[in-house]
């Protein structure tokens, strides 16, 4: 684990609590992480994604954040993508094919994507090894009325045990 931490992230050691969190995720425990900004939360799901077979679905509320993380991961040699708005230029079926055959480790989507039954059906065909909700504090800070799609996340546990 430390070898992968050094190779991809450039750290020789974990920050406080990161190793225990990663171990919890690797043990297939549901894990809630609350750390301050800059505390290293993202690494807590990114590292297990590298250590496990398959890919991790990351649910993120902001397109710009998804794009930044995908760019950062790809620059580090970690294949990542995010599902863009369904359009003629980027049809969802093509994006799903990219996910299915592209050997990605991290795939990102907005909570609104989870409201689409076709998206969920196609997501079931992917070798998911975990689901992370990034920026989860936004749920309580922004309120359930601002992004009601966040409520759909609760059903993922049954669909992807």
Question: Where are the language model's segments positioned?
Answer:
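Conserved pre-motif I regulatory segment
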Residues: 1-36
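Active-site phosphate/pyrophosphate- and oxyanion-stabilizing loops and adjacent acidic/basic residues
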Residues: 3, 46, 154
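Walker A/P-loop
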Residues: 28-47, 57-60
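Loop/turn-to-beta-strand initiation segments
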Residues: 30, 54-57, 79, 102-107, ...
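Conserved helix/coil segment N-terminal to the catalytic DExD/H
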Residues: 39, 46, 87-130, 138-144, ...
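Conserved P-loop NTPase motor "coupling/switch" region that bridges the ATPase
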Residues: 129-133, 148-161
């Amino acid at each position: 684990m430390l070898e992968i931490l050094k190779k991809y992230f450039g750290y020789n050691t974990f920050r406080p609590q990161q190793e225990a969190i990663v171990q919890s995720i690797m043990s297939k425990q549901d894990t809630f992480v609350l750390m301050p900004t800059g505390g290293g939360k993202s690494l807590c799901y990114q590292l297990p994604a590298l250590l496990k077979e398959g890919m991790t679905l990351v649910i993120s509320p902001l397109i710009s954040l998804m794009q930044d993380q995908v760019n950062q991961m790809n620059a580090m040699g970690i294949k990542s993508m995010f599902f863009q708005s369904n359009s003629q230029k980027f049809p969802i079926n093509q994006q799903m094919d990219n996910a299915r055959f592209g050997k990605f480790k991290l795939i990102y989507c907005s909570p609104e994507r989870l409201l689409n039954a076709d998206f969920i059906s196609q997501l079931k065909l992917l070798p998911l090894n975990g689901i992370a909700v990034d920026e989860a504090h936004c749920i309580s800070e922004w309120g359930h009325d601002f992004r009601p799609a966040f409520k759909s996340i609760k059903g993922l546990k049954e669909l992807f045990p």
